[in-house]
A protein has these predicted regions:
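Charge-rich, low-complexity N-terminal segments
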Residues: 1-123, 127-128, 132-135, 178, ...
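Short hydrophobic/aromatic beta-strand micro-patches
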Residues: 3-5, 147, 229
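Alpha-helix-loop-beta-strand connector modules within alpha/beta enzyme cores
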Residues: 296-308
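The catalytic core of metal-dependent phosphodiesterases that act on cyclic dinucleotides
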Residues: 214-287, 307-322
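Charged helix-capping and loop-helix junction motifs
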Residues: 206-212, 239-242, 291-298
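Bacterial c-di-GMP phosphodiesterase EAL domain
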Residues: 103-217
Length: 322
């Protein structure tokens, strides 16, 4: 455990130097604090060896050199980290033995053939993104990401619509997704489609429409996963929950998308438990460098394990993140 103090620019530069040094592995930033004064002002460098000194002696020395009053140290997060580390209340994970630069990544080229053009009358494009089961080395499902016909983002596509059209169009695009999956020939792979949660509430007969379109395009309801995003507040939760129950009764799977980025978070998870939970990519990005992100994801993993919810990490682009 290292405590670095100083101006932000110098501390960040020193931290990056330490992290880049080949003699150090698994260097993670646990916290970054902005205090009115240094905790060990003018002390210089102090080294403590827990293989030589007792935890009690080290802790006494740390408190001796501290420039904070004793009543402040008991509530200070930095001192809590120090005390936990010294006393061994939290197990120290073993250093990672992987070397990312020695890994070989294999790519399955065009597993579903060449891309398809727009279907007749199709109002938007779709990007089919594979969801991979890394331990088995295979694609477990495909997520249909909506795009404007200019290739623009979903936000841009929906902003181009009148407000009263948004939920109706959101629902209608799922029919095109199912048609695309049928034409592409996804076999037994699962298909995940994103849906604004309020589309299930504001569009009459939404569930019946989805189930009809799934069967019309020769897909099995158990093959389809409806991903509801956290980025929209759910009003009328009773109606939403009723729609969820109907979908599940038909065999359709449910997922919470972008978990950790939106309105509901854990509150939504207490009210309905999906088959899958997808951690927002902002939490996953550079997780190998962030102690807070690791702690949060560790808690999410524990929660989903207890609830038997399959967990998906969004946006993994580096071996270190995996």
């Amino acid at each position: 455990l290292q405590i670095l103090e100083g101006t932000e620019q110098r501390v960040v530069a020193l931290f990056n130097t330490i992290r880049a040094d080949d003699r150090h592995t698994g260097v993670v930033e646990l916290m970054r604090d902005y205090g009115p004064r240094r905790r060990f002002e003018d002390v210089g460098m102090l080294l403590f060896d827990l293989d030589v000194q007792t935890p009690k002696a080290v802790l006494a020395s740390v408190l001796h050199y501290s420039k904070l009053e004793s009543y402040l140290t008991s509530e200070d997060r930095v001192f809590k980290f120090i005390q936990t580390f010294i006393t061994g209340k939290t197990a120290i994970p073993p250093a990672s033995d992987y070397e990312p630069d020695k890994w070989t990544l294999s790519r399955e080229r065009a597993p579903f053939g060449k891309g398809l053009g727009l279907l007749a009358g199709q109002p938007c494009q779709f990007a089919l993104q594979p969801i991979v089961e890394p331990s088995e080395g295979k694609i477990s499902s495909l997520e249909a990401l909506i795009r404007g016909n200019d290739g623009g983002s979903p936000e841009h596509f929906f902003r181009s619509l009148d407000r009263e059209q948004i939920y109706e169009v959101d629902l209608q695009t799922k029919a095109w997704t199912f048609a695309l999956a049928q034409k592409l020939g996804i076999g037994s792979h699962k298909l995940a489609v994103n849906l604004l949660p309020m589309s299930l509430v504001n569009v009459p007969g939404a569930v019946e429409f989805l189930v009809t379109q799934i069967k019309k395009h020769n897909l099995q309801p158990e093959q389809v996963i409806i991903e509801v995003t956290e980025n929209e507040m759910i009003s009328g939760f009773n109606q939403f929950n009723s729609a969820i129950k109907q979908l599940r009764a038909e065999g359709v799977g449910l997922a919470i998308d972008d978990f950790g980025s939106g309105y509901a978070g854990l509150s939504l998870l207490t009210r309905f438990q999906p088959d899958k939970l997808k951690i927002d990519r902002e939490i996953v990005s550079d997780i190998h460098l962030s102690g807070p992100k690791q702690a949060i994801v560790k808690s999410i993993i524990s929660c989903c394990t207890d609830l038997e919810i399959t967990l998906v990490a969004e946006g993994i682009e580096k071996i270190e993140e995996w």
